[in-house]
Each structure stands twice: as C-alpha cells, then as structure tokens.
C-alpha cells in the first residue's frame, strides 16, 4: 500500500476522483496490496529457503575431516520443491488479478470507451490481447498442481520418496514467462486508457514510465 501511494503521489487525475460517485472499486483494484503482498510473501519465503539450501551441506555421504563417511538426507529437494510450488501459485495469482484489471479497462465504464477504442462497433480495439491474458492465466492455473505432492520410487525402492523439485522449478519458470506477457499486456492497456484521461496528468513517475513504453509501442 505504501508503494502504491508513492507511485501515485502528485497525480492530478487521482485528485480529481477524490469525491466521485464510485463507492467501491472491484477487488482487483481495491485489494491490490493484499493480493500482491501475499504473493510477495511467498517469493520471500522461497528466497529464504534458497539461501539456506545454498549454504547447506548437501553431499551424500558427508566425508568428515577424520575421513568418516556419514550417510544422510540433506540432499533431498523437498524444501525447495514445496517452496517453488508455493511461489508458482503466487506468480499465477498475480497474473489472475492482472487479467481482471485488463477486463475492467475494456468494458466501457467510468468514462473509458469499450475496448479502449472510439469506434468499437467496427474496431476490435484491444479485445484480442485480453484473449491472450485469459489463455495465459488459464494455462498458469493448470501449472499450479504441486509437483512436490507427487513421488515415484526409484533405485529399486532405495530412493522411495523423491521431491520432484526439478519439475517444480520448470513449472515456476514457465508461469513466470507467462506472467511477463500478461503484465506487458496490462501495461499496454493502461497506457491506452491513459490517453482517454487527458489532459489531467498522472504522477511524474507514471508519466515517465508511460513515455518510455510509448517509445516502443
């Protein structure tokens, strides 16, 4: 919430809506700090566990200074596997709520034209990119099944419980790639919506970011 206040500081557009007739915004706007914050907590948890594992002794067996061989289980990937699955859900949820905000920008309410175009009857505007976000969000949901909940015995039963952490890592990376695309579409939609809010400026930081984006799109 503090970060959002910083980003919006000095926005004349925000000030102009201080006493408008909108009682409550939809959850996807009003609950951004709570939803994004929950995802941030999940990623922080993954970071903490990753640092622990990077500094841990994971060899097996462990050879001591006295040349004693000690068999152990520090190599097991369950700590990271479960954290990666948790982080995957967190990343997918950021995309889920972003898609809802994209939809809000396109539905033709609160002074914005439908599909963010002035001729929505003949011009599809930004309708198709929202198809993309919807598809990517759905794909991310299918990738949220926790790989760490599964286990297949190997090595004649000696390795009878495995973490499937490599699968967790691959799924996390795939969801992050999809999330990049979803957020890029949301940014482009927001920039287009901004054009219909002129001449009132947003905050200096947001105006700067929009100018950078408009140099590319």
Q: What are these model-derived regions, one by one?
A:
Residues 1-217:
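C-terminal auxiliary extensions adjacent to catalytic cores
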């Amino acid at each position: 919430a503090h970060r959002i206040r910083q980003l919006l500081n000095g926005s004349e557009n925000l000030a102009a809506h201080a006493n408008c007739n909108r009682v409550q915004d939809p959850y996807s706007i009003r609950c951004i700090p709570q939803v994004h914050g929950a995802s941030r907590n999940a990623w922080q948890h993954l970071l903490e566990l990753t640092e622990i594992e990077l500094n841990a002794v994971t060899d097996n067996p462990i050879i001591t200074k006295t040349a004693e061989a000690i068999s152990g289980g520090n190599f097991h990937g369950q700590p990271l596997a479960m954290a990666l699955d948790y982080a995957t859900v967190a990343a997918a949820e950021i995309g889920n709520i972003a898609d809802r905000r994209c939809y809000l920008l396109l539905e033709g309410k609160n002074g914005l034209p439908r599909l963010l175009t002035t001729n929505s009857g003949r011009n599809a505007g930004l309708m198709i990119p929202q198809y993309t976000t919807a598809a990517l969000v759905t794909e991310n949901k299918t990738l949220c099944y926790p790989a760490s909940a599964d286990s297949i015995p190997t090595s004649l039963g000696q390795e009878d419980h495995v973490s499937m952490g490599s699968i967790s890592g691959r799924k996390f990376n795939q969801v992050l790639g999809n999330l990049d695309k979803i957020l890029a579409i949301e940014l482009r939609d927001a920039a287009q919506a901004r054009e219909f809010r002129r001449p009132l400026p947003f905050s200096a930081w947001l105006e700067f970011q929009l100018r950078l984006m408009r140099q590319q799109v």
